Amino acid sequence: MVVVAAAPSAASAAPKVLLLSGQPASGGRALPLMVPGPRAAGSEASGTPQARKRQRLTHLSPEEKALRRKLKNRVAAQTARDRKKARMSELEQQVVDLEEENQKLQLENQLLREKTHGLVIENQELRTRLGMNALVTEEVSEAESKGNGVRLVAGSAESAALRLRAPLQQVQAQLSPPQNIFPWILTLLPLQILSLISFWAFWTSWTLSCFSNVLPQSLLIWRNSQRSTQKDLVPYQPPFLCQWGPHQPSWKPLMNSFVLTMYTPSL
């Protein structure tokens, strides 16, 4: 049996649907065939794409609709499973990378702890060699108490002591020369002070003797120069002023004589 559902109009782009079934619908399933319908002449001439409309499934039976829905659900579920699997694989790779990085950091932390322990031992030995008391701070004790969870490699203290033997010998060799030089410094320091005192006394006496020889000569020269300047002075002669004349507005002989006596220098 063949059922043909034609398009409502020739100009519409909806395809024709042909349902081919050899038996009735209850006995078997129909196979839908999608046949493209003729396009409109105006749309071919213009070449503009038309908006795709959602296909209506009014021509399908309920069984066909349910089958189509099941297929869509299967495809969606498969894509979701693939996406979830890819995400899980990515997360697993991240976990592996983080575990490797954590192991590297733990190893580095352990090596740093060993190094600090060796440095503490070296510091204590140097303090004991210098005659100072080994200082055990509270921070070191707290760090050791907190670090009990992390196990140190056995024999780390022994290896640190073996590594520190050669540096300690070098430090001892470097510290021994100053200890030998210290008595020499104590003996040479007073001699140096005495030499400085004697040099200072000699310098002061020499400068005083030089100035004592130079000062009288300079005083004599200064006195001679003062005397020569006093001898070479020209006596001051006041200008001649007429006590009475047409240039005087009034007669003041006493005031004029007083002015003359004030300006005449004493010879």
From Swiss-Prot:
The keyword Signal does not apply. CDD domains: bZIP_XBP1. Isoform 1 interacts with HM13. Isoform 1 interacts with RNF139; the interaction induces ubiquitination and degradation of isoform 1. Isoform 1 interacts (via luminal domain) with DERL1; the interaction obviates the need for ectodomain shedding prior HM13/SPP-mediated XBP1 isoform 1 cleavage. Isoform 1 interacts with HDAC3 and AKT1; the interactions occur in endothelial cell (EC) under disturbed flow. Isoform 1 interacts with the oncoprotein FOS. Interacts with SIRT1. The chain crosses the membrane at residues 181-198. It is found in: Nucleus; Endoplasmic reticulum. Keywords: Acetylation, Activator, Angiogenesis, Apoptosis, Cleavage on pair of basic residues, Cytoplasm, Developmental protein, Differentiation, DNA-binding, Endoplasmic reticulum, Membrane, Myogenesis, Nucleus, Phosphoprotein, Signal-anchor, Stress response, Transcription, Transcription regulation, Transmembrane, Transmembrane helix, Ubl conjugation, Unfolded protein response. Residues 199-267 are lumenal. The gene is Xbp1. Belongs to the bZIP family. Isoform 1 is ubiquitinated, leading to proteasome-mediated degradation in response to ER stress. GO terms for biological process: adipose tissue development; angiogenesis; cellular response to amino acid stimulus; cellular response to antibiotic; cellular response to fluid shear stress; cellular response to glucose starvation; cellular response to interleukin-4; cellular response to laminar fluid shear stress. Functions as a transcription factor during endoplasmic reticulum (ER) stress by regulating the unfolded protein response (UPR). Required for cardiac myogenesis and hepatogenesis during embryonic development, and the development of secretory tissues such as exocrine pancreas and salivary gland. Involved in terminal differentiation of B lymphocytes to plasma cells and production of immunoglobulins. Modulates the cellular response to ER stress in a PIK3R-dependent manner. Binds to the cis-acting X box present in the promoter regions of major histocompatibility complex class II genes. One of its GO terms (molecular function) is DNA binding. Residues 69-85 are annotated as: Nuclear localization signal (NLS). Residues 91-126 are annotated as: Leucine-zipper. GO terms for cellular component: cytoplasm; endoplasmic reticulum; endoplasmic reticulum membrane; nucleus; presynapse; RNA polymerase II transcription regulator complex. This is X-box-binding protein 1.
